[in-house]
């Protein structure tokens, strides 16, 4: 299965957001790190900041709404947005995920990331 996902450039992720501070950690598979253009040894906190800092500013609210909707519902939520790749390209991303845990300390989301502008 991993070979199939890697072959079609689908990156998997798990995000942990501290419910008190709002700080996030982005845990990724190898394909996701490749899509983000980051090294394998990046920390989850650095990875989250990297992803967040390269979001297109005009679409930040759409992504924030997706995160809020995932936290509030028990359904899978999807959003498409431009993302500024470190190699200089702006790519269109389809992100799909769901909330898998929420308590007083942490909110956990899981999902996938796919660059769709390369079709």
Regions found by a protein language model. Name each.
Residues 1-50:
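PAS-family sensory domain signal
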Residues 11-14, 65, 76-83:
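PAS and PAS-like sensory modules
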Residues 14-17, 85, 115:
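Residue-level signal for short segments within beta-strands and strand-turn junctions
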Residues 19, 26, 77, 82-88, 90-91, 101, ...:
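PAS-family sensory domains
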Residues 39-42, 51-62, 68-75:
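PAS/GAF/H-NOX family sensory domains and closely associated sensor/linker modules
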Residues 46, 76-78, 95:
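Short coil/loop residues immediately preceding or within conserved phosphate-binding loops
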Residues 90, 95-118:
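Short loop/turn elements at sensory-signaling interfaces that couple input to output
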